[in-house]
């Protein structure tokens, strides 16, 4: 068996399909519902940056800081982020499906650190999930800022 937070593009699609099947109680339409949701969240229109995201990213970039996106999403994140300001300003984009681990796995955080060339204490994670972002980021030794 795979470790609980190990992932890949295939595993992420299967995990999301299982969530849809559970929510819709294995209805005959589950496959169609999953396909619609998969398509929907692969489109730019489905995403809305936080209202203060632009000012936060601009402040970081103006100070010469590296800004990266690190998400429990799949490789579609690259195309989506490239088309949405301020996400398109990010220096690097990390999708869990490409890293091979999803948050809260320590391996996710270590891989991002290695690819950024940073020590844990040099990283500020801005996130909205109390467990996957805030608690896991702190456990990894990162600075964290919770947003809603």
PLM features: residue spans?
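N-terminal helical cap/lid subdomain that shapes the substrate entry/recognition surface
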Residues: 1-58, 62-63, 75-79
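Asp-based, Mg2+/Mn2+-dependent phosphohydrolase catalytic module
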Residues: 30-35, 54-61, 65-148
């Amino acid at each position: 068996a795979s470790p609980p937070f190990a992932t890949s593009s295939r595993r992420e699609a299967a995990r999301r399909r299982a969530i849809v099947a559970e929510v819709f109680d294995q209805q005959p339409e589950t496959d169609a519902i999953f396909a619609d949701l998969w398509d929907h969240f692969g489109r730019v229109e489905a995403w809305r940056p936080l209202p203060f995201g632009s000012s936060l990213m601009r402040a970081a970039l103006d100070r010469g800081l590296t800004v990266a996106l690190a998400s429990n999403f799949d490789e579609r994140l690259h195309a989506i982020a490239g088309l949405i300001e301020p996400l398109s300003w990010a220096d690097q984009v990390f999708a869990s499906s490409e890293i091979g681990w999803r948050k809260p796995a320590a391996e996710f955080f270590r891989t991002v650190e290695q690819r950024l060339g940073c020590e844990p204490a040099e990283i500020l994670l801005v996130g909205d999930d109390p467990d996957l972002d805030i608690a896991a980021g702190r456990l990894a030794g990162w600075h964290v800022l919770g947003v809603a």
